[in-house]
C-alpha cells in the first residue's frame, strides 16, 4: 500500500528539458531569469527560466571559433562573454540578440573567466560616477554605419541606439579576469581593455575570482603529471589596483573608449572596402574579358585614345562597346560606380574623420592624465608613449585626407569618361545625341585623357591582383591590406609645401608636424596606428601585472578526476567572493573512505587579515522526510557544489547505498550552520597549509550535517552538476549525460510529489512509487480519489517527470 507524506518536500520543478547536444558550461544571468549554455558543437544558447524556453542561439563559425571553453556574465547582465580555444578569441555578445559587440584575441586558450563588479565607494569615485562624460558634450555623436554592407559585426549600425554606451555599460568599474594554460592570467577593464597581465603562476587555471574590493585575486590551478593532476590554491595581493582605484577607473574608461573607437574605424574601413570591391567587380567583369580576347597588339589605352582623338573605334572595341557593354549597360555601370565612389567618400568624411577626431580627443585627455605623475606614473601611464600614439592618429588623418583628394579627382575623371563614352556609343548606333551632351570642353578632354592614362595603363605590379591587366582604379590601392607601396602614389612634383618640408631637416623632425607616408596605403597607416596605440597602452598592463604578487599558496589535492574535460568546464572546484564580509570561499572535495567529502576553504580578501574556521570539512549524515516518518542514513559523496548566494551553498550528493534513479539528492546547505559561533573553536584547522590537504584529511575539522528540510530526492535523473542563482531563487541541475536539465524554484515547496519514505515498499514490490500524471488510467484516478475521500488529511502529490529523459 502506498504511503503519502504529511509535509511537502522542498523545491519545485519549473522546467525540464532534454537537449540535443551535450552541455559543457552553464551560467545564470546575475540580473534576469536567463541562463547561458555552451555545448560541444561550439554553440552558445540563451534560455529563459519559464519552461526552459530558448531565447536565441549563437552558432559556431570560422571567424569567431567553434570550441567554447567558458562563459561569464557582465555584472549588469547586459553582456555575455565567452572564450573560444581554437581561435583564442573572447567574444562579448549582446543579451538582446546573438550578435558580437566586441571581440579580441588572447595569447593562450582561456580555460576559465570571472567578471567582477567593483563595490568600493569613495567621494572621488562617486563624483566621477555622477559626472557627465565631457566627451558627450564636446564631441559630435558618431554617425551610424550603413546597414547595406556585409560587415561581420552589426555594432554601430543600429538607429537611435548608442552602441558604444551599450558596450561600455555603467561607469562603475567592472573587470573581466581570464585564466588559461601555463599560468596565463589577464584582467580586462569593462571586459574590453587589458589593464593587467599576471606572471609567476604555474599550471593551468581552473578557477579564479577577483575580490570586489580589489584587494586580492584567488586562483586555483592544476599541474598535470603522470595521469594525475595536483590542484593548488593561490591568493595574489592586488594592492596597486585598490590604492589607485579612482585613477584606475578613469584610465580604464579612457582605454575602453579608445578600444571602441578603433573598432568603429575598422568597421568603417570594412564598409569602404566592400564599396570599392563593388566598383572593381563591375569594371573587371566587363573590361578584363575584352583585354584577354582582343586579337590586336594595341593596348586598351591606345584603343580608347584613338577613339578620343579621331572619333572612330576599332572593330574589336566597337564589338566590346555594342555587345558587352551596350548603351543601357554603360549608363547603369556609370551610375553604379558613381554611387560606390560617393559611399566611400561619405564614409571617409563622416565616419573615418569623426572617429579619428574622437580618438585624438581621448588620447589627448589620456596624455593630460599621464602628466599628473603623482597619480598616474605608478600605474605605468607614459606621456611619451601617448604622444607617439597621437602622432600616429595624425598620420592616419593625413592619409584619409589624401584619399579624399584622390576620390574627388577620380570621380571627376570617371564622370567625364563615362559621359564621353556614352556619347560615342550613341553616335555608333546613330541615335540622337542631346546638344548639352555634345558639348565637350578642353577640361573635359583632359579629364578623359587623365582617366585613360591612370586607369588603363598596364601595370605589371597588378598582374596577380584583381584587374591584373590594367590599373583599374586608383582608390582601391589605398584600401588594400598589404605592406606593398602604392602602385600609383600621389604626384608630389611641384608641391611647394612638400618640397619645403623635404629640404628642411628641422621641420621634417618637428613633433608639431605629423609624419606623412606618401607611398603607403590607408590600411598600412591604420595598422601602424593600432600597433603604436596598443604599445602605448600595454605598459600599464605590464606595470599593474608585476605588482600583483603571490601571497599565499595552498596545495589542495591530487586527483585523476581533474583530467576529465567536462568536469573542468563545469567549474568545480568553485570560487566565490562574499562582497559583504570581504571573504574568498573555495569549495572542493577530498576522497575519504571511498566518499568525496566537501571542504570549504575561506580566506579574507585582505591578505593581512586572518579569518576563523579557515578550513572545514562537511559530511552529510541523515535526511529526514515526512515529518520524521523516516530517516535516510547512508554514505553520501559530493558530486558538485556551487554558491547559491552569500549564505547558502547548493550541493548535489550521491547516495552510495541508493538504488539507480533514486540515489541523487539536491541540498541547500546554510553556512550559518557550518560556521556556528558557539563551537567555532572546536573546528579550527591545526594542520599545515604548506602540506597538501588531502594528506591531512584526518585532521581537517569536519561537521556532519543532518537535514529535515531544504533537500530533495532527484528521481529519474543521474544528476551530476548544478548552477544556482540566489537572486532569482532558482537552480539548474544537469545530468551526467550532459543533456538532461531540470530547473527548480528553490524557495517554494513542491505540491506535486510522492513521499520518498516508501523506499522499502518500492524495493519489495519491485516497482517505483513515482506516479506519472500523464499515464494514470481513469480507474487509478478514481481509486486515488476514493482514498483521499476516506482520509482528508492525506494529500496525493503527482509530478510530471519523464524517466526516459535521462536514458
Swiss-Prot record:
It is found in: Nucleus. There is a cross-link at residues 772, 797 (Glycyl lysine isopeptide (Lys-Gly) (interchain with G-Cter in SUMO2)). Residues 770-785 have a biased composition (Basic and acidic residues). Pathway: Protein modification; protein ubiquitination. One of its GO terms (biological process) is anaphase-promoting complex-dependent catabolic process. GO terms for cellular component: anaphase-promoting complex; nucleus. Residues 755-788 are annotated as: Disordered. The keyword Nucleus applies. GO terms for molecular function: protein phosphatase binding. Keywords: Cell cycle, Cell division, Isopeptide bond, Mitosis, Nucleus, Phosphoprotein, Ubl conjugation, Ubl conjugation pathway. It comes from the Eukaryota. InterPro entries: APC4, Apc4-like_WD40_dom, APC4_C, APC4_long_dom, APC4_metazoa, WD40/YVTN_repeat-like_dom_sf, WD40_repeat_dom_sf. Component of the anaphase promoting complex/cyclosome (APC/C), a cell cycle-regulated E3 ubiquitin ligase that controls progression through mitosis and the G1 phase of the cell cycle. The APC/C complex acts by mediating ubiquitination and subsequent degradation of target proteins: it mainly mediates the formation of 'Lys-11'-linked polyubiquitin chains and, to a lower extent, the formation of 'Lys-48'- and 'Lys-63'-linked polyubiquitin chains. The APC/C complex catalyzes assembly of branched 'Lys-11'-/'Lys-48'-linked branched ubiquitin chains on target proteins. The mammalian APC/C is composed at least of 14 distinct subunits ANAPC1, ANAPC2, CDC27/APC3, ANAPC4, ANAPC5, CDC16/APC6, ANAPC7, CDC23/APC8, ANAPC10, ANAPC11, CDC26/APC12, ANAPC13, ANAPC15 and ANAPC16 that assemble into a complex of at least 19 chains with a combined molecular mass of around 1.2 MDa; APC/C interacts with FZR1 and FBXO5. In the context of the APC/C complex, directly interacts with UBE2S. Interacts with FBXO43. Belongs to the APC4 family. This is Anaphase-promoting complex subunit 4. It comes from Mus musculus. The lineage of its organism: Eukaryota, Metazoa, Chordata, Craniata, Vertebrata. The gene is Anapc4.
